[in-house]
Amino acid sequence: MKAKSFAVPSSALSPDGYIINQGLLRSVSFGRYTAADCGCGWISAYNLLHFLTGTRDMETICRDVEKYVVLRGRLGVNFLGLWWYLHHRRGCRFRLTLTRWGTERVCRRRKAPCGIMLYFHRHGAHYITFVPGSDHSLRYLNLVYGRACDERPLKDVFRAHVLLPLTPTLIYLGPTRRAS
C-alpha cells in the first residue's frame, strides 16, 4: 500500500500555528482525496485542539479523523464521527447547538467560547473553528482561506457565508470527567 504523504506548507498556517488556508493542502491526502478538497473536518479538529492544548501534531489528528470520512472522503467527515473522536478520544465535552441563536446564547454564557461549526453554503458544507477574539467577538479559522485574524460577530458570518439556518455547532464546555 502506498504511504500517504503529509506536508503542510508554512504559508497555510497563521503566525500562531492554526491552519488557515485549506486550499494550500493539496499534498496532504485525506481519504481518497486531498485535504484541500475535503479536509475541513480534521482541520477544525486540529485548530480546536491547538487552541485548547497547544498541540501541533497535525498528522496524527488528520489520520485519526480520517476514520470517520463519508464516501471515502468525498463528503468530508461525518459530524457525529468528529464529535465521537473529540469526546471519546480527546476528552472534550461539548454543548450541541443547531442554530445561530442557540450558538450565540451558549457563547454569551462562556468566558472564552470556542468550538466547531458545520455550515452549508452554495457549494456544499464546510467546518470551521472559532476561538475567542478581542472585544467579545469570535475569531474564525479556515473560514476565509488565508485570513489569519478573521474576527467578527457570528451574525456577520451568517450573513456573508451561511445558506441554511441549520448549523450544527459543538461548543467546548471543558474536559470530560475521565480526562480531568
Specify the residue positions occupied by each region the protein language model found.
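Intrinsic-disorder/low-complexity loop/linker signature
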Residues: 17, 101, 123, 177-180
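Extracellular-facing segments of soluble proteins and assemblies that are Gly/Ser/Thr-biased and enriched
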Residues: 63-85
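Generic detector of well-ordered alpha-helical segments enriched in charged/polar residues
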Residues: 59-66, 83, 104, 155
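...with weaker cross-activation on analogous glycine-rich loops/strands in unrelated enzymes
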Residues: 78-131
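Short coil/turn linker and secondary-structure boundary residues
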Residues: 56, 77, 149-152
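Noncatalytic regulatory segments and standalone regulatory/sensor domains
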Residues: 2-13, 108-111, 131-180
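Short flexible/disordered coil segments
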Residues: 67-69, 116-133, 157-164
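Active-site-adjacent structural segments surrounding the nucleophilic cysteine of cysteine proteases
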Residues: 1-71
